Amino acid sequence: MSSVLLFLLLLLLSGVSLSGCIRLGNGGYEEWRMGSATYIKESLGHPLNDGGGACGYGDLDIFRYGRYTAGVSGALFGRGSACGGCYEVRCVNHVLWCLRGSPTVVVTATDFCAPNLGLSDDYGGWCNFPKEHFEMSEAAFLRVAKAKADIVPVQFRRVSCDRAGGMRFTITGGASFLQVLITNVAADGEVAAVKVKGSRTGWIPMGRNWGQNWQCDADLRGQPLSFEVTGGRGRTVVAYSVAPPDWMFAQTFEGKQFVE
């Protein structure tokens, strides 16, 4: 057998696609890239379900992200810009640990996988820069690999997010500032820019405080609130009068959604 035929056979056995690309919304394409993945056992719990997480989502069931989620390394996280983005992931190049046929799973980036600079990149320092690594939920990991695996090589690519219902806006803040957590974002999943408008103001740009929490220094109490949200690929949606004039801090409101 020639070396070329042998190479192609190995690709097929490992489940690697020869097509290479997937169509994203707004005419974009993204190719498969190589990375790695580990997982957090459900029996150990997860910091997100205790109100933590670098994206600020807290309980993922409340915010409709479900069980197929992942923390991503700094090379992917982008200081929070990756929060809410969707990735298709499959285990490759490991006959022992990858599931047969290399099935895929789509995960949402909901947390940051912190580096461990005291360990080497290939032994414990999976999330050290510039590694592209996914620390997946157990449910997501078991869709592509066996539970006994500690770490597996994967291919991944950005895909559009499929969400039910509209974008959700959870309002917090105080007398001199407004903060909003934006969740359940379809299409890009990521949020690149946000503006807010009250009935007595123009559009006010908000800055990313952390994760998907956006903030501006303005007292907008007693005014209906509208939000302009720009996704990671430049598309903008305006959700008018999402919150009524009598809104209160810690309330969540649902507004317009990105549509492919």
Curated annotation (Swiss-Prot):
Q: How does it sit in the membrane?
A: Peripheral membrane protein
Where in or outside the cell is it found?
Secreted, Cell wall; Membrane
Q: Where is the chain membrane-spanning?
A: none
Q: Which InterPro entries match?
A: Expan_Lol_pI, Expansin, Expansin/allergen_DPBB_dom, Expansin_CBD, Expansin_CBD_sf, RlpA-like_DPBB, RlpA-like_sf
Task: Give expression by tissue.
Answer: Expressed in panicles and flowers.
Question: What span is annotated as the signal peptide, if there is one?
Answer: 1-19
Inducers of expression: By gibberellin (GA3) and wounding.
Residue span(s) of domain Expansin-like EG45:
52-166
UniProt-recorded name of the protein: Expansin-A16
Whose protein is this, by species? Oryza sativa subsp. japonica (Rice)
